[in-house]
């Protein structure tokens, strides 16, 4: 059967063309008998064997699904090609080039880091976890901006009957397959990881790590010249742990991630300067404009792609070198 299909695999495919495949197989067996490679008994037995009994067909994942744990990294690369005018004037021509153009694509995937990222996810919030929590890990090399791993707790698929199937790339922006929400934002709330950007602007404005702060919950006056309508004097953030409602300093506030202390830091700065700084290292809205300048930004309340936050931290790790 296999020998008969090699001349024209599609034409003699035993799954889609069983009759043609059987005729071809019988022809091969006849030639083998003539050349005395098999006996008449072996010939009769083989010819009498139905094609269906020889097949054990199992579905193999196609496209990026065949990349295993790196399927979403693969999808990111595919979306990069399909969204870039460098590869054609429209999506159809880019897809044609991608599938039939003989492109040789070299990626930045680090298999060791990809495996480590996937192992961490599956060990903590695995695919199909009862909590329903979506989890993703993105790894970027500081100084180069190279994406080295993208992992998430879902199966790569078209969102069929299995609720864990999706082709959305949780870590990415909309252009690369990320989750674009109805309000025009993409990704997830970064939460307290955004405090690092507040701290960077704090130092940029000449403030010190030893500056005293009060972490006692209260309201603040905000400096938001680019969006004065967002100045909410009634907003009063709270600390997760009431024992932190006390005097502190910037160093301890960072170490303990104290919400109210960081709110005081933000109140001493221009909130617009913080969003502009965030934009300078790639943390923006889906359309590339700065995040909304509002007090709650100190708690990471606005959705951003995890890859953007990973790249922001890579900028810190590289000594301030931001790579798009």
List each model region and its residues.
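Thr-Gly-centered strand-to-loop micro-motif
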Residues: 264-265, 299
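Non-catalytic, structured segments within soluble enzyme domains
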Residues: 1-108, 115, 284, 290, ...
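Structured alpha-helical segments in the cores of large, soluble enzyme domains
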Residues: 81-89, 270-279
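Helix N-cap / loop-to-helix initiation motif
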Residues: 38-39, 110, 270, 305
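Extracytoplasmic/secreted proteins, especially bacterial periplasmic and envelope-associated proteins
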Residues: 1, 20-33, 45, 68, ...
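Short pre-catalytic segments that frame enzyme active sites
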Residues: 10-14, 49, 95-101, 111, ...
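Generic structural signal for hydrophobic core residues of well-folded globular domains
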Residues: 3-9, 36, 81, 201-202, ...
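Sequence contexts marking disulfide-bonded cysteines in secreted/extracellular proteins
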Residues: 63-65, 73-75, 225-227, 271, ...
């Amino acid at each position: 059967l296999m020998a008969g299909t090699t001349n024209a695999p599609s034409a003699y495919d035993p799954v889609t063309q069983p009759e043609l495949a059987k005729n071809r197989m019988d022809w091969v067996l006849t030639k083998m008998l003539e050349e005395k490679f098999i006996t008449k008994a072996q010939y009769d037995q083989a010819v009498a064997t139905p094609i269906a009994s020889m097949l054990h067909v199992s579905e193999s994942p196609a496209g990026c699904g065949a990349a295993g744990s790196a399927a979403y990294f693969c999808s990111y690369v595919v979306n990069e090609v399909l969204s870039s005018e460098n590869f054609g004037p429209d999506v159809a021509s880019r897809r044609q080039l991608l599938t039939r153009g003989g492109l040789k694509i070299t990626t930045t995937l680090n298999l060791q880091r990809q495996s480590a990222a996937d192992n961490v996810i599956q060990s903590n919030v695995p695919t199909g976890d009862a909590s329903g929590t979506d989890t993703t890990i993105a790894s970027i090399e500081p100084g180069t901006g190279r994406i080295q791993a993208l992992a998430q707790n879902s199966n790569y698929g078209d969102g069929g009957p299995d609720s864990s199937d999706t082709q959305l790339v949780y870590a990415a922006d909309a252009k690369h397959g990320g989750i674009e929400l109805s309000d025009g934002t993409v990704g997830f709330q970064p939460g307290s990881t955004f405090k690092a950007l507040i701290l960077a602007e704090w130092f940029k404005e000449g403030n010190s790590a030893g500056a005293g702060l009060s972490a006692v919950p209260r309201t603040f006056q905000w400096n938001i010249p680019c969006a004065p309508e967002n100045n909410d004097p009634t907003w009063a953030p709270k600390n997760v742990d009431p024992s932190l409602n006390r005097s502190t300093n910037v160093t301890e506030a960072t170490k303990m991630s104290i919400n109210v202390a960081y709110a005081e830091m933000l109140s001493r700065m221009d909130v617009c300067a913080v969003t502009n700084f965030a934009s300078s290292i790639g943390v923006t809205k889906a359309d590339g404009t700065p995040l909304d300048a509002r007090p709650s930004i100190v708690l990471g309340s606005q959705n951003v792609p995890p890859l953007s936050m990973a790249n922001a931290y890579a900028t810190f790790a590289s000594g301030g070198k931001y790579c798009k």
